[in-house]
UniProtKB/Swiss-Prot annotation:
GO terms for cellular component: cytosol. The lineage of its organism: Bacteria, Pseudomonadati, Pseudomonadota, Gammaproteobacteria, Enterobacterales. PROSITE patterns: CSD_1 (PS00352), CSD_2 (PS51857). SMART domains: CSP. GO terms for molecular function: nucleic acid binding; RNA binding; sequence-specific single stranded DNA binding; single-stranded DNA binding. It is found in: Cytoplasm. Its main location: cytoplasm. Keywords: Activator, Cytoplasm, DNA-binding, Stress response, Transcription, Transcription regulation. SUPFAM superfamilies: Nucleic acid-binding proteins (SSF50249). Gene3D superfamilies: Nucleic acid-binding proteins. GO terms for biological process: regulation of gene expression; response to cold. Induction: In response to low temperature (at protein level). This is Cold shock-like protein CspB. It comes from Escherichia coli (strain K12).
Amino acid sequence: MSNKMTGLVKWFNADKGFGFISPVDGSKDVFVHFSAIQNDNYRTLFEGQKVTFSIESGAKGPAAANVIITD
C-alpha cells in the first residue's frame, strides 16, 4: 500500500505529535505521527491543510508516511 493519496488534516495535536488525516476519496481516517511529516522546519500540521501521503502498516494499524504539505 504505497500509492500516494491526498487528504485534509482532520486534527493534529502538536504537543503530543500526532493526529489524523481524512483522505479525499472518503476512505477511513489515517493516523499520522509527526515523524512522517516531510519538512525541514518544525514538523506540525494544521486542521484543514491539504497533504499528500502514502500508507504503511504501523504497530497499531495503518499510518500515514511521507506526508507532504501541498497547500
